Amino acid sequence: MKSIRLLLLLASGVTTGAFAQSGGLTDMSQSRFAKMANTELGAVHWTDGFWGDRFNVYSHTSLQSMWDTWNNPDVSHGFRNFEIAAGVCEGEHWGPPFHDGDMYKWMEGVASVYAVTKDPELDKLMDHFIEHVVKAQRADGYIHTPVIIEEKNKGIDTHSDKQQQTVIGTKVGGEDEKGAFANRLNFETYNLGHLMMAGIIHRRATGKTTLFDAAVKATDFLCHFYETASAELARNAICPSHYMGVVEMYRATGNPRYLELSKNLIDIRGMVENGTDDNQDRIPFRQQYNAMGHAVRSNYLYAGVTDVYAETGEDQLMKNLTSIWKDIVTRKMYVTGACGALYDGTSPDGTCYEPDSIQKVHQSYGRPYQLPNSTAHNETCANIGNMLFNWRMLEVTGDAKYADIVETALYNSVLSGVSLDGKKYFYTNPLRISADLPYTLRWPKERTEYISCFCCPPNTLRTVCQAQNYAYTVTPNAVYCNLYGANTLATTLKETGKIGLVQETEYPWEGAVKLTVTEAPKPSKKKAFSLFLRVPDWCEKATLKVNGEPVQGTWKANTYAEVNRIWKKGDCVEWVMDMPVKLLEANPLAEEIRNQVVVKRGPLVYCLESMDIEGGHKIDNVLIPADIRLTPKKITIEGSPIVALDGTARLVDEVSWKDTLYREVGKADKPVHIRLIPYYAWGNRGKAEMTVWMPLARANH
């Protein structure tokens, strides 16, 4: 036992320093104010189990079906727009202006798969797409297919070095509003930000610079634009993926101009006249302490500002970010990790009557504790944005509580956006579906192969195909296990050397994790390093063994357990987390879910679908006893192995509510067998009602 030192680590105790790693999803290896860094692309491979299954589905079925969609102009003009802009064929732009960025997200997903599989067919596919991007890009670095196509159709030579960057679209609100940055709803900076990230990931995965060079040109264009454009144009940007993109370009190139731009973007946001809460620019960012407005835009902004903090260490930014994070997690986030309660609303709402200050918001955060179920928007992109924000907060603080939110969102409100077979998609992720809802919501209740707003499918593709990169983080002499799953890790620690691990687990179905050292520092080094195991928020009890010897300790949720020793090949760590079924209740201020419960086991939130109620009873008539016993049961849905929960609930007397608003409380004394399935798996067995929150029937005493 002398060689084993066990610590309870409150993540704020992680040391800083430069890391050997470079080339992860976010390369904070040289970021002065980061506490940990990603492993390299390709360092982690799923081998089996839950994430092995999901990676296989997404990297094969989803990737290909999405390309088939992009490549079919009768369904989507996504790729055809690039062909027209590249001069391969003639035509007009068709589709949303943000489709360019959506294709870049798809491209980033393909590159992330290639980093693992090295499939030459994927390499060819990427080269084919990149060829069109490069041909479409203007000589000055600008690329946005609606504008490029407009210019080409007006006979403008977009490849001329003498071409001015503002030939079309220099006047906001003018007749030429289709031009560069003339209309904030053109999403140019959003598109360019995703081009930057796609170019970086492609280079890190393949070693090629074709798309990266295009991204450098685009970033240089953006720098020049912000240095020379009118204030009106410079402030005209929404959905700021470019904050993350510009900082990552700085990390990839070392160009200080890019870091300066990233800092200026925050300053410019505070100078907007007639700004909106929907776009998070009504007041300067440094005065914002609560999450507001469009949930995708806000979460992207918070992730990007965290990137800026990692490079600058500005205390005020961290004050804003930690306050906003607390507002989200303790007052505005769904139990599934989803964000964005409102389809449409006003801001502020319910706090004052000042007509001049009331604004419209959409796809937005609501008021504190405003968490409706049937009308929850919860766009998949917003939930991914929540992951991006929390992942960066993990890297800059080392605090395990951020990894917990990454896991919660990924398992529940991100995976729910795609069918189990990887072919159909949701745009929104409500927590309740009722056949009796007396109005029609904007988005369908069933997943479809193509959504007119096709931003979420490629975003989910890249996120799931990159999930292995969330499994571990590193410091110069430590490896942190953040996302459990059967995998292999091969990496190098700056102060220790090459490290290899094999992780075996049935997580999230079971809480047992086994880690075996497959490569350790050479005997001549005899240098100790630490292995940190994340203690999830839901974990109240865990046991730890090293080479079969029990290690005594008490571990608090949302921390790490540390094992520090001189490791050798063959060393084995067994980490077992108790995974009981839990009933959760909400803060009573959350009126829509008061006196209701949600079932959770491990990281998974469970739901009830109408076909899983014995006797075909209505879902609204099922109550969950406070003392219900739910038994795990292995089942299969759409070929995907799942652990369901079986138990006996109570049934309310079934009386029609037609033309009735209120009535006397009925009896709830009839037992009824129910089966709960993980929320991410709902909607895969045909049309059905569904609910996450269910009325609580308290035990009689």
PLM regions and their residue ranges:
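Bacterial Sec-dependent N-terminal signal peptides
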Residues: 1-23
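Low-complexity, Ser/Thr/Pro/Gly-enriched N-terminal "stalk/linker" regions
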Residues: 21-102, 127-169
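Solvent-exposed loop and edge beta-strand segments that line ligand/cofactor-binding
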Residues: 23, 86-103, 119, 156-158, ...
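C-terminal beta-rich recognition modules with glycine/proline-rich loops and embedded aromatic residues
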Residues: 23, 73, 262, 321, ...
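Well-ordered alpha-helical scaffold segments within catalytic/enzyme domains
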Residues: 49-53, 57, 107-120, 193-208, ...
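Extended ligand-binding groove/face enriched in aromatic
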Residues: 86-96, 114-240, 244-276
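Catalytic-core region of carbohydrate-active enzymes that cleave or remodel glycosidic bonds
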Residues: 310-331, 371-423
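Solvent-exposed beta-strand/loop surfaces of large extracellular or lumenal domains
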Residues: 539-564, 583-589
